[in-house]
UniProtKB/Swiss-Prot annotation:
GO terms for cellular component: cytoplasm. It is found in: Cytoplasm. It comes from Chloroflexus aurantiacus (strain ATCC 29366 / DSM 635 / J-10-fl). Its EC number is 2.8.1.8. GO terms for molecular function: 4 iron, 4 sulfur cluster binding; lipoate synthase activity; metal ion binding. Its cofactor is [4Fe-4S] cluster. This is Lipoyl synthase. Binds 2 [4Fe-4S] clusters per subunit. One cluster is coordinated with 3 cysteines and an exchangeable S-adenosyl-L-methionine. It holds the Pfam family Radical_SAM. InterPro entries: Aldolase_TIM, Elp3/MiaA/NifB-like_rSAM, LIAS_N, Lipoyl_synth, rSAM. Belongs to the radical SAM superfamily. Lipoyl synthase family. The keyword 4Fe-4S applies. HAMAP family: Lipoyl_synth. It catalyses: [[Fe-S] cluster scaffold protein carrying a second [4Fe-4S](2+) cluster] + N(6)-octanoyl-L-lysyl-[protein] + 2 oxidized [2Fe-2S]-[ferredoxin] + 2 S-adenosyl-L-methionine + 4 H(+) = [[Fe-S] cluster scaffold protein] + N(6)-[(R)-dihydrolipoyl]-L-lysyl-[protein] + 4 Fe(3+) + 2 hydrogen sulfide + 2 5'-deoxyadenosine + 2 L-methionine + 2 reduced [2Fe-2S]-[ferredoxin]. The gene is lipA.
């Protein structure tokens, strides 16, 4: 479920001859190298608290910009995922036992950074019955205790269709519930072998039914082999379950062993996706080459609330 955001050279599709085609990145895909006082302060705090961020684990190109604004997306439940999605840079394998003290450390970090908006995400934890949902809930509760004015977005996995786990997260009343659809149905099982497109749609529909005023959000990556028409179809499908906020960004492979980049989608096409989504009723759309789920997340909740 992690956002794929590599900083290194991307893997790209191989031509029929078998030679690896590695074109230079377009200018619009270049991000500023991370640095600055605030960046190093956030980095130090994460190390001191033994915390993980999706910013680092998924190699986000926006890490410098976000951390210099003293914002970060906290990665709960460790840094090892039980799934092997073909696009994701986060480590895979057998994770350590869940750290029940992690919510306290995250809440302390949110307070230290004086955040007004915190984003919580996680690896998949198919090795535990609730998928780690209780850690999401406890983290939300502790953030609210320590920083009452801080709004919280959760970017959750599918919990393998465990709707009781979803209910646990919803009961903690996050301000935004995000679950990324990631790609189009035709590519889904190859891109995300242990996930199901319709299950993700059902999760978003259940969240809306359980909490009608909740801001719901989803995102996808493009340039992975889909057609633009398929992107429009996914946009329509997400609106059919009343998703409020949509993010669309360029797929970039961590290295050549991952799912290949098939093409670089142009800024003009991203603008067309945004216009189409807004016309279909999304209240906030981020669509651009370097857009990732958590980018400008603090702007989404106000724009999207019913």
């Amino acid at each position: 479920m992690a956002e794929l955001i590599p900083l290194n050279e991307v893997g790209v599709a191989q031509p029929a001859s078998g030679a690896v085609n590695r074109p230079r990145r377009p200018e619009w895909l270049k991000a500023r190298a991370p640095g600055g006082v605030n960046y190093h302060d956030v980095l130090r705090l994460m190390r001191e608290k033994n915390l993980h961020t999706v910013c680092e684990e998924a190699r986000c190109p926006n890490i410098g910009e976000c951390w210099n604004h003293r914002t970060a997306t906290f990665l709960l439940l460790g840094d090892i995922c039980t799934r092997g999605c073909r696009y994701c840079a986060i480590g895979k394998g057998k994770p350590k036992p869940i750290d029940e003290n992690e919510p306290e450390r995250v809440a302390e970090s949110v307070a230290h950074l004086k955040l007004k908006f915190a984003v919580l995400t996680s690896v998949n934890r198919d090795d535990v019955p609730d998928g780690g949902a209780h850690i999401f809930a406890r983290t939300i509760e502790l953030i609210r205790q320590k920083v009452p004015d801080c709004k919280v977005e959760v970017l959750i996995p599918d919990f393998d269709g465990n709707w009781d786990a979803l209910a646990t997260v919803l009961a903690a009343e996050p301000d935004v519930l995000n679950h990324n659809i990631e790609t189009v149905p035709r590519l889904f099982r190859r891109f995300r072998p242990r996930a199901k497109f319709e299950q993700s749609i059902e999760l978003l529909a259940r969240a809306r039914a359980a909490r009608p005023k909740l801001v719901t959000k989803s995102g996808m990556m493009v340039g992975a082999g889909e057609t633009n028409e398929e992107v429009y179809e996914v946009i329509d499908r997400l609106r059919s379950v009343d998703v409020n906020v949509l993010t669309i960004g360029q797929y970039l492979a961590p290295d050549a062993s991952y799912w290949p980049v098939h093409r670089y989608v142009t800024p003009a096409e991203f603008a067309e996706f945004r216009s189409y989504a807004l016309a279909r009723g999304f209240t906030h759309v981020e669509s651009g080459p370097l857009v990732r789920s958590s980018y400008n997340a603090h702007l989404h909740v106000g724009a999207a609330q019913h």
